UniProtKB/Swiss-Prot annotation:
Domain S1 motif residues, every copy: 622-690
The organism of origin for this protein: Ralstonia nicotianae (strain ATCC BAA-1114 / GMI1000) (Ralstonia solanacearum)
Protein known as: Polyribonucleotide nucleotidyltransferase
Annotated gene: pnp
Origin superkingdom: Bacteria
Regions crossing the membrane: none
Keyword vocabulary terms for this entry: Cytoplasm, Magnesium, Metal-binding, Nucleotidyltransferase, RNA-binding, Transferase
Amino acid sequence: MFNKIVKEFQWGNHKVRMETGEIARQASGAVLLDMDDTVVLATVVGAKNAKPGQDFFPLTVDYIEKTYAAGKIPGGFFKREGRPSENETLTSRLIDRPLRPLFPEGFYNEVQVVIHVLSINPEVPADIPALVAASAALAVSGLPFNGPVGAARVGYKDGQYLLNPNRAQLAHSDLDLVVAGTERAVLMVESEANQLSEEVMLGAVVYGHEQMQIAINAIHDLVRDGGKPEWDWQAAPKNEALVAKVSELGLADLQAAYQLRQKSARSQKLKEVYASVAAKLAEAGVEADGVEVDNILFELESKIVRGQILNGEPRIDGRDTRTVRPIEIRSSVLPRAHGSALFTRGETQALVVATLGTKSDEQIIDALQGEYRDRFMLHYNMPPFATGETGRVGSPKRREIGHGRLAKRALIPVLPKEDEFAYTIRLVSEITESNGSSSMASVCGGCLALMDAGVPVKAHVAGVAMGLILEGNKFAVLTDILGDEDHLGDMDFKVAGTDNGITALQMDIKVQGITKEIMQVALAQAKEGRLHILGKMQAAMGHARTELSEHAPRMITVKINPEKIRDVIGKGGSTIQALTKETGCTIDIQEDGTITIASTSSEGMAEAKRRIEGITAEAEVGKIYSGTVLKLLDFGAIVNILPGKDGLLHISEIANERVNQVSDYVKEGQMVRVKLLSTDEKGRMRLSIKAAKAEEGDVPATAPQAPGAGDATSQQQ
């Protein structure tokens, strides 16, 4: 019934098993991959024909985590998986990026890749198995695909590279780098690093590419024994006559458009050229598909821009290959925000805002490997007006989530540890103008906003987006690329870091001829650009502000006996709720007895601290307290000296003379000074007004003058 093909291989410390032919047989391709109990199912379905008028490649990649993979039931009312989590979105992008460039030009058939996580080993992240399984599923499907693709995660500790480190190793690693590529070339890099050098980063990329060959070879074996016949697909032949005609009608105007340095003027001119060519073709009686004409014009644009750069001519905006666009920086832009910065680089601009919160503001993430809390959030938004367009405004798209994550990776290594700066931090980057490199503008603006908020970052962090154009043996590396250069180039990569090293590196490579030497040149030029931007940032803001904004919460920490936590919380939370409401403070209690009090009011914090210390204080024998008389008894009175701490004031301890009536000396609600004489094994306390007055040097208490009072005194003496 099943033609099941299985391939097993050892990959570093992991045993991997790939199989096809048993599950999801109606898909174009399906592979089940097991990597030390992390199991993923990757499926591929490709449409046999492209839709009429299709002018782009409709590839979708969906990475889906099932909670049963971790033996859990989803939370919420409906008890089933809902919208994709941030991790699912980021992993979908991670898989998409190296696969997309390997489909042939002109292939516009719809392709859907779906990866389900069916079982999770908490120590083995599922992203690498998912990427390898997706590549294998495409390879066995027979679709036109220039793969297979391999992938590997690389760590770095004590001068050694680690292959596919587990989560415990990653927690202590100075590097978390994912690299994907084919047998011959690297296609994608995504990484976070603890200020590592360009040499170490490039070495990690090369090491990962070497180690992924094990997985690529296993995929070849799987295809040889279990692959489906290759599709009989051929790209449509080029209409050379149409290419020549479009070139004749539009080339000169396109060249003129690319002499315009301002993006808006250039974009408008290009639209006019496209419309003009279409109109002239119609006038000439040339029948042509509009999509085909647009593609020819785009190819002409690409040749113009690439040719100018490779010939040493100025770039689109007039710069040479190494120059960073003009930078303008302004901090404290928003009066009520805790920290803010406006970072402008050419026609790219980011308004980044920092907000400080308490531990209760941390994001709680219910991941497959277990719940954890995140004290640093970075959210990136790019509304359509940033590019002078109209469009949908709403929940963030995949691109926005990915750009936010990249900027976050760049800043994490310089953040202070929680015991140095206990605040929860949220950065929001609002892209108000975009012409390339908006994620790196978010890094620069984010660092400045943190410093403006008074966050003691370890160093300035800057980011720069780089491009590369390769034709045969000629290549050019571009610093601080524009949006058009991004689309027309062969590689774009983003590097962020400090004066000391790289904190984040992202590469996307569209061709397979880029060597280690070319990447070395590109990284060296990126460092030059990064240091230039860092110089501008350091001149604008040399260090973090020493004082927090007056609108930011202040925090103090109180340590109590963990057994007293219930007293602070109170029955049904009554005590903590009253404290929060009456003092206007946010109060967070940890299991170890650490209490954090946060408020914009120093008076409110002081009052909350005083009351918490009162609730949790231990009564000390021999200490004098101001107490409140709660109840009178025939033989004395009950006095409250601390919250929840009542003691007996015996009649003999009220005054030196004989006391006949307790009410002659103290009243309910009266404040009295009492000394704690002793506490028995049951916690019962003996109090004394006599001893307190004697120690403090006051005149001994006497009863109010009343009939018989003098006799009582003489009798006691």
